Amino acid sequence: MVAAITSAGYTADGASADFNWGDGDVWRKSANNTKWCLIGCSIGDFGTIAAFQFVFTDSGWSPMMIMALAMFNGIMTSIALETAILSAQMALNEAFRVAIGMSLISMLSMEAAMNIVDLVLTGGAKLTWWVIVPMLVAGFLTPWPYNYWRLKKYNAACH
């Protein structure tokens, strides 16, 4: 019975087919997908932090409120960028649905990683020349395995 279930691609009693984490082609494609997500998230995230750091300096917002808004804006700009990229391949409303559904977990983990690095290294929502690279590295590496897994398991990607 277990063999019949696992041969159909499902799990039973903790048994499942071995998952291959060593597929170089999938790692490359998932890295490309992660890169586009990182570009979109970074635009909104860095833009929000920079706006509060350089323009709205006396806003009264706490660093945590700024970071929450930066995460939200990062996700929104990533969805907008991914929708624009996908709209070349499909209808705009379908591209929007795919952009939201396929990459939300990736974007949330990316934004959380970037803002945690910012908080740990600068003590708040601050952009300095030396914090941007660690934020981008953390933002890329955190969701990359998930993007690989999703692409490998479901052959599903955002781009």
Where are these regions (language model features)?
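C-terminal halves and exits of single transmembrane alpha-helices
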Residues: 101-123
